[in-house]
Curated annotation (Swiss-Prot):
Belongs to the long (4 C-C) scorpion toxin superfamily. Sodium channel inhibitor family. Beta subfamily. One of its GO terms (biological process) is defense response. Beta toxins bind voltage-independently at site-4 of sodium channels (Nav) and shift the voltage of activation toward more negative potentials thereby affecting sodium channel activation and promoting spontaneous and repetitive firing. Negative results: does not affect the cardiac Nav1.5/SCN5A, the peripheral nerve channel Nav1.7/SCN9A, and the voltage-dependent potassium channel Kv1.5/KCNA5. It comes from the Eukaryota. Keywords: Amidation, Disulfide bond, Ion channel impairing toxin, Neurotoxin, Secreted, Signal, Toxin, Voltage-gated sodium channel impairing toxin. This is Toxin Td7. Has the structural arrangement of an alpha-helix connected to antiparallel beta-sheets by disulfide bonds (CS-alpha/beta). Expressed by the venom gland.
Length: 73
C-alpha cells in the first residue's frame, strides 16, 4: 500500500508574515532552517529570503495573494 505525501516549495515566513531574511546570515542558514521544518533543501534566493524545497504541506510559505508582511496583525 502506497502513501502519498504532499510537498511544496516556497519562501519561509515568520509569525509576522514576512519572508525569512538571509542577507546577513551564514551560508548554511536557509538549508538548516528548511531541514528543521522537514524540507529537503534550501538556499538564500536573490530576493534575500530563504527558499525551501519539498516542505511538508503543513508548513506555511509566502504567497503574494495572502501576504500580510508589513500590514500589522
Amino acid at each position: 500500500i502506497g502513501m502519498a505525501v504532499e510537498c511544496k516549495d516556497g519562501y519561509l515566513v515568520g509569525a509576522d508574515g514576512c519572508k525569512y531574511g538571509c542577507f546577513t546570515r551564514p551560508g548554511h542558514f536557509c538549508a538548516s532552517e528548511c531541514s528543521l521544518l522537514k524540507g529537503k533543501d534550501g538556499y538564500c534566493y536573490a530576493w534575500l529570503a530563504c527558499y525551501c524545497y519539498n516542505l511538508p504541506d503543513s508548513v506555511p510559505v509566502w504567497d503574494s495573494a495572502t501576504n500580510r508582511c508589513g500590514k500589522g496583525k
